[in-house]
Amino acid sequence: MGHRSHMQSVELLGEVALPDASLAVEPAPEPRRGRIRWWSIAVVGAVALAVLVGTQVVLDTRQRAADARFAAVPGVVAPMGPTVRVTWRPPDALSGLVLAGVVADGAFVGLSVADDGSQAVVAVDQRTGDVRWSTQVFGADGSRALWLDRSVAGRCALAAAHELACLVSNDFRHFDRASSPPVVRATDTRVVLVDTRDGRMVADRDAPGATSMAVLPGLAVLGAPGRGVTGQDLLTGAERWRYTPPSAGEDLSQAAFTSAIQVFAAGDLVGVTNPGWSVALLDATGELVRKPVPAVAGYRYDQATGTLALLSTTESGQVRTTIVRTGRDVDLPGTYLDVSVDDGSVPDLVLTSDVVLRAWDVRTGRARWTSDETASGPALVLGGRVYVSTMTGTVALDGRTGAIVWRSTVSPGHAPGSLATDGRTILVADQPVAGSERSELVAYGLGDGRPVWQAPLPDGIRSSTAVGRVLLGLTADGAVVLG
């Protein structure tokens, strides 16, 4: 295993002379040279083997400890090897659920829309694709089945360690137009709470008119057009507080303004946003902790780091990022760069990107370093390093100084996909920009960036991304689970 055994020199015994030849009754037997040599070499070999075995045991123990440590880091996938294959393929009814990426108890959990238009909350084993349980929330719907709107994104969120809350509705869209498909309005909207271990329905209550939901411990915050935002007891639906967003102003239609309002959870805060206009922040009691401020470029909530970033655009068209912090916000140039995996090895780090990559201390707003690299996707933070994809490859930078540790390049005419890691390597698709050439999955060593292995992705898979503990292969019409 990369270790050399060192042979020791051994002195072999020659003939042994008797003190007095007259005392010898018969000739002394010849020394058994071969046996002495064999045992000596065997002892040395055994020692060398023991050293090798002991060293390997230590290395294996360290690797298992590292695997266990990284397995506890959100976003790190299970160890991958050079034999890349499709372990299971979600049917159409489960594809949206898998891509939504809500994981509990080792399963993808969320809403599923079947071919007959019925809806259910489902748990699908991440490793095997087996449906563990399915709890129906709406029966067959012929109209929905005709147009088969399977959109379920943002409908479910974890409410506790073993509880999933979902906003379910019988509205859907007609996809018979190229743009702006008309919506069939809901006649039944409810909040359901399901035990993720067995699918048992914990609560099922009405939520008339709600179109978005944010979940905090014991609280469902619902946004409903024309009705404002209400904080309700998650189990009973009892109203705890109400928030009415400010008027749109003379330059916006109030009806259009209120119909677009959405809510989202950001740690222990709730955001109330009108996309392209403003973001307000409330705490769990409904108290306004941040008045609506312009955020015409939107917002980012990074679950890996717990960072809430509000994005705005200057008059010159440049994007700026405001990091929301208790007591003191931090205003930074550039667009907040998402971090999909963070093991905490570079504390208080925030990254922004435009024509350059910048690192900041989120506590003080001071610049740590600037790199000429231009990030093309979310970053990974592991072992004190920052890993980012660019248009030409993958770069590893020292998290403290920004110095380049290593750089890899993709094949000519190719671009890298999003970065993932199994805690041993950086996993990234080397994918063609155009044409039918096959993509490859490449595993780069975390330390030196050398390819550990590379393998063609199965037919029809162009790129890959990490969701939960699995690596997904992305196809033209959905995703498959790779192993």
Where are the language model's segments positioned?
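Secretory-pathway ectodomains
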Residues: 2-483
